[in-house]
A protein has these predicted regions:
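Beta-loop-alpha module in the N-terminal Rossmann-like domain of NAD(P)-dependent dehydrogenases
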Residues: 49-88
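N-terminal Rossmann-like dinucleotide-binding module
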Residues: 1-46
Length: 88
């Protein structure tokens, strides 16, 4: 099985506690990009992941195969739709 290149849509509490640790410890996934609008909190724990500043920047990356939409609930539909339309 090939490794799936993953982008994480946010690095708030759920990204830090649940999503990034799961992705980074699962041998089938590679955490490649993380959206952090202003900070760079993920850099210490995930130095190989690239920090991007927007969701739009994340979905435009052709290398990203899967996007974890862990943003506030009110944005889930729109971000999931955009990710699916981008083939993620």
């Amino acid at each position: 099985m090939e490794i799936i290149k993953v982008g994480l849509a946010a690095y708030g509490m759920s990204g830090q506690v649940f999503h990034a640790p799961f992705i980074s410890t699962n041998p089938h996934f590679e955490l490649c990009k993380i959206v952090e609008r202003s900070k760079e909190l993920s850099k210490e724990r995930y130095p190989d992941a690239t920090i991007v500043r927007s969701f739009e920047e994340l979905i435009k990356d052709p290398a990203i195969e899967l996007i974890v939409v862990n943003t506030p609930d009110s944005t889930h539909y729109e971000y999931a739709r955009l990710a699916l339309e981008a083939g993620k």
